[in-house]
Amino acid sequence: RSRKSRKRSSAGGNAVIVDGYSKQWLDQGFCWVYPKEIIRHPPGCRPGATVQIRSEDGRDLGAGIWDEGWIAVRRFRQDHGPIDKAVIAFRLDKAIALRRELIGEQTTAFRWVNAENDGLPGIRIDAYAQFLVLTLDSPSLSGLVEPICDLLEERLEPRGIFQAWRPDPRDKLDTSKLEHRLARGRAPAGDVRVTERNIACLVRPGAGKDIGIFPDMRDNRA
C-alpha cells in the first residue's frame, strides 16, 4: 500500500510505535524494526507475537512478528492484518514461480526462498534434489514452521523437510536448545546427489544449515 492509502489510527495501545527514522525505512520497503527505533510497545509482548506497527502520528505501517533480539520486529505485510497461512502462501508462490522460470533442470540444489528478498524475513528454504531445508533466523518464527511445511508439501511434494537454525550471533541465544530436525517426511538413507549446472556433488540435508554446498554462492563457483 502507498503511504497515502495508509489510515491513521487513534488506538496505539496494542501496536508497536516507531520513530521517524524507522518510518522512513519502512516506507521504502524494509522489513526490520530495531529496538532503538521503538518508542513504545504493548506490555507483556512475547517473541513470536504478531504486532501492528505504527508511526508516532498513528499511521499504519504494517504487521510483523515481535522478537527480543538484535531485530525487534520482522515485518511480513505492509498493511493491517494477520500473518496467516494465506500471507505465507502468496509470498511462497511468487518465490516458487520465479525460481521455476530462472533455474534449469540441470540444477537441483538452489534456494527457493531467500528471506526478506522474497517477503519472508528470517526464513530461507533450500532445495537439495527431493529434500528441503527450512532455515530460521530466530525462535520467534517457530509458529510459522507448520503452515510453511504444509504449503511446501502441497506445492513441491518433497520426500523430506528438515528444519535448521541460523541465529544472528548478536542475539546471544542458547543455541544448545536449537536442534536441527526432520520436520516432515523421511530422511535420506545416505548422502543426497545434487547437480549444479550438471556438475554433481553429494550433500547431507540433515546436517543442518551448512551441509556441503551453499546455494546462494553458486555464482562464485561459476
Segments the model singles out, each with a brief description of its role:
Residues 1-129:
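Non-catalytic accessory regions of SAM-dependent methyltransferases
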Residues 48, 210, 215-222:
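Conserved alpha-helix/loop element of class I SAM-dependent methyltransferases that forms part
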Residues 84-91, 140-148:
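Short amphipathic alpha-helical segments
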Residues 113-126, 142-213:
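Non-catalytic substrate-recognition/targeting regions of SAM-dependent transferases
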Residues 129-142:
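A short interface-forming secondary-structure element
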Residues 130, 201, 220:
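Conserved hydrophobic/aromatic pocket- or pore-lining residues that grip, position, or stack substrates
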